[in-house]
Amino acid sequence: MSKRKDIQKIMVIGSGPIIIGQAAEFDYAGTQACLALKEEGYKVILVNSNPATIMTDKEIADKVYIEPLTLEFVNRIIRKERPDAILPTLGGQTGLNMAMALSKAGILDDLEIELLGTKLSAIDQAEDRDLFKQLMQELDQPIPESTIVKTVDEAVTFARDIGYPVIVRPAFTLGGTGGGICSSEEELCEITENGLKLSPVTQCLIERSIAGFKEIEYEVMRDSADNALVVCNMENFDPVGIHTGDSIVFAPTQTLSDIENQMLRDASLKIIRALKIEGGCNVQLALDPYSFKYYVIEVNPRVSRSSALASKATGYPIAKLAAKIAVGLTLDEMTNPITGTTYAMFEPALDYVVAKIPRFPFDKFEHGERQLGTQMKATGEVMAIGRNLEESLLKACRSLEIGVCHNEMTSLSNISDEELVTKVIKAQDDRLFYLSEAIRRGYSIEELESLTKIDLFFLDKLLHIVEIEQELQMHVDHLESLKKAKRYGFSDQKIAEIWQKDESDIRAMRHSHSLYPVYKMVDTCAAEFDAKTPYFYSTYELENESVQSNKESILVLGSGPIRIGQGVEFDYATVHSVKAIQKAGYEAIIMNSNPETVSTDFSVSDKLYFEPLTFEDVMNVIDLEQPKGVIVQFGGQTAINLAQSLSDAGVTILGTQVEDLDRAEDRDLFEKALKELGIPQPQGQTATNEEEALEAAKKIGFPVLVRPSYVLGGRAMEIVENKEDLREYIRTAVKASPEHPILVDSYIFGKECEVDAISDGKSVLIPGIMEHIERAGVHSGDSMAVYPPQQLSKQIQETIAEYTKRLAIGLNCIGMMNVQFVIKNEQVYVIEVNPRASRTVPFLSKVTGIPMAQIATKLILGQTLKDLGYEDGLYPQSQLVHIKAPVFSFTKLAQVDSLLGPEMKSTGEVMGSDTSLEKALYKAFEANNSHLSEFGQIVFTIADDSKAEALSLARRFKAIGYQIMATQGTAAYFAEQGLSACLVGKIGDAANDIPTLVRHGHVQAIVNTVGIKRTADKDGQMIRSSAIEQGVPLFTALDTAKAMLTVLESRCFNIEAI
């Protein structure tokens, strides 16, 4: 069957901001799909609220709308554009839920719009727990005993019948949100109550727990002619009970017999056929390790995180082909883009092992609940490819960027056996390292298997790694041992550690014996056919398949796994940089380790190396490719941190030079540079120990801002008000980077703004100034930003532009630079300079129309701004107002305080644009899910230093019809000033405290501030948690509340008696 001619215009729904459970994999899927549909001649309309994506670039679709993904706005766009069809399956859970909402509102029927890919009935059957159960029974597919409940009492009754433990799964939620394993009635009541609230249809599935079974996933495709195939099967290292997004995963499956594989494969194909899905689908199954008994856990009737992993693991472009299937093409008439000769109907075969390890945010959230369960907590993931499991696992470990180069954390050697066993049983994000430590201590793999239910096969591989470590210890400088260790994925750094040498000694020894890695191609067919793809991984074998071309090449380093502080924005810059390199006539090579992103799509670059971003792995690629140079500006802190060691090894770093990078990062050098350039900065000093820090604070005067140098995303940054707090900070936080000193700065509580600039060394283009809504003290990544600035005088803007220019030229910046300023009493101070692409590049590129990363790359390659037709200085402002607003994932992270401060906590961003500030703010709040009713009750619980400011806000809220509620101290202050407020009870006062009022739906918003120090108190944290759990808008900075008030006031009519 060929493609459909009866539809011309297709709307694609994106997945919105990055949150835990829904990350960059949907940017990858959406980009692929839009391009595939355009390739087939359809007109594509894209709607997505996330500006930090490649998908929302103008050239990806015919029309791109960056608007809130709410029924109100999507409906408007549909009525304006009148698409013939909508493709919702590439927008994750957001896309599916939007399709359901459009259907329920009657919009699809009313406008005669068809849903492509997955029919509504299939979404319903896969997502609605009751219908899913019925379908499985019809297909004779086993599922765990379960019941659907709409109340907590129903859950309790069922659990009493079948016994504990049970699993709670809310319907229509993402990444296991609201679910969990319950081993007691108390846990069941709590989790079910929460789950029912989070489910849009107030429905939960309560099922018998099959924790301990093997968790297996099949990624399947089907077309309209009922052809179906398995693209990839994957096996979780962790048994059932831990969300697959938080599990280590291997592809292909490692421990299944042929019979088991065929049995589960048949089940998966039977399910996709019954659902009549046209496109991709993910089936999760649980297999009893001791029999042929299995259960179907769940089905995702859409492209998912696992399909991004499967695409990268096999090279088979699932999203691209799913989009083409949705418009009627069939698997037997499309060629596989990797080989160019075989058809898409040909199931991929792998002659290597792929390992995926999740990346968790607990380096940022030290107090977060780290125990893993059915609710996802990872922000991103890394993938590595090897010829054996050990090699791929160890490569993945060193890709994580958590300070390890092996499956070993040195700090664990000091813990007691008792703690070790507890951590092995109760899985946390770092269980792999505890398991490996247990094996090093001599625990048998049989003991560990009975404690963890992890398959002996996997534990035996961990044992094998430890045996190689022991062999290396016994045979120092032994060539055969070195060869063996390299074959199984050991890094030079680890071997050096064991042999008590420097990493450079191991590298020299390898080179003297011509022991280099070779690069193998990912070709989907286990080398059975010729492949055309330039997609490679390293291994220690004989035949090298990556041939150096005659063209001069440039290597771009990616940004590794997505984590808080380093998100998809850096991938955006990487992809744009590659486009510019190709346009300039060079071969563009990408090196990255993140399977979710667009940059690791093999069609983006001329060559892709899927490798860890470590000195050794990067140097190996450089030794083979001999590029003209390496670009480190677009890979965030990951790439910048490699610049020095690469430069020391004689590699050409293109763009800003290492010594200039150092002048921006090193405190003393930076201060000196600012003095020379005549640019003011907050008074500050460097300290290497407690005494120096106290001395510095005394000299500067409290409050001071303290932080380690060389960090990203405000890691371990705090505002301290007195000596005791400073001592406490130094004892707990300074370990963030021991060889670098800490910085002690005068804390200026003023207006913040930031600038991204592009420099060729002589001229500087400043696309725009972004003004932060929150004052200093909230991390720039967590602030709402406005462009163009609304409250900065022309003079201040000119000063900012002038300082930016001086900095760019004075620091010899070639390419990108980001500068942050604080303004107090009309005086502009520089807070920090980052001589690299920052997280605001995609936003600013979109709103100004300047392709910043591409221009920066052209300058890095030797062109000037004048050559490119750009003037020196501040670019003319946009006529519209644009807001960038942060998005948080607190619902997924128990015990992480949602109080905003100098350490970054947001996982993603949205954008709102319109003709006025109020309209743009309204869109931004709608897009990040902070919908506030026109009237209701608002609670104020305010620190002393901001009560006066809060009073004027409370008066304005009252004027538009809100009832003001307040805690004791705040209510008393308001009353003194003539504003009466309803008193709420102290925490623990069961009937009237804030958490209880919130739970019963009596509170529409909470304003809660904690004073300049921004540290959490227990009561405050309970209040904030209750707001997060119940989805009540919470403002921990008065500026954000003021912005929301501006929106509400603009939507109110003036009602006054005459």
Swiss-Prot record:
CDD domains: MGS_CPS_II. Its EC number is 6.3.4.16, 6.3.5.5. Its cofactor is Mg(2+); Mn(2+). It catalyses: hydrogencarbonate + L-glutamine + 2 ATP + H2O = carbamoyl phosphate + L-glutamate + 2 ADP + phosphate + 2 H(+). Mn(2+) 4 binds at residues 832, 834. Large subunit of the glutamine-dependent carbamoyl phosphate synthetase (CPSase). CPSase catalyzes the formation of carbamoyl phosphate from the ammonia moiety of glutamine, carbonate, and phosphate donated by ATP, constituting the first step of 2 biosynthetic pathways, one leading to arginine and/or urea and the other to pyrimidine nucleotides. Mn(2+) 2 binds at residues 298, 300. It comes from the Bacteria. Residues 930-1058 are annotated as: Allosteric domain. Mg(2+) 4 binds at residues 832, 834. Pathway: Amino-acid biosynthesis; L-arginine biosynthesis; carbamoyl phosphate from bicarbonate: step 1/1; Pyrimidine metabolism; UMP biosynthesis via de novo pathway; (S)-dihydroorotate from bicarbonate: step 1/3. The keyword Manganese applies. This is Carbamoyl phosphate synthase large chain. Residues 547-929 are annotated as: Carbamoyl phosphate synthetic domain. Residues 133-327, 671-861 form the ATP-grasp domain. It is an enzyme of class 6 (ligase). Signal peptide: none annotated. Mg(2+) 1 binds at residues 284, 298. Residues 1-401 are annotated as: Carboxyphosphate synthetic domain. Keywords: Amino-acid biosynthesis, Arginine biosynthesis, ATP-binding, Ligase, Magnesium, Manganese, Metal-binding, Nucleotide-binding, Pyrimidine biosynthesis, Repeat. Mn(2+) 3 binds at residues 820, 832. It comes from Streptococcus pyogenes serotype M5 (strain Manfredo). Gene3D superfamilies: 3.40.50.20, ATP-grasp fold, A domain, ATP-grasp fold, B domain, Carbamoyl-phosphate synthetase, large subunit oligomerisation domain, Methylglyoxal synthase-like domain. Composed of two chains; the small (or glutamine) chain promotes the hydrolysis of glutamine to ammonia, which is used by the large (or ammonia) chain to synthesize carbamoyl phosphate. Tetramer of heterodimers (alpha,beta)4. ATP 2 binds at residues 707, 746, 748, 752, 777-780, 820, 832. Binds 4 Mg(2+) or Mn(2+) ions per subunit.
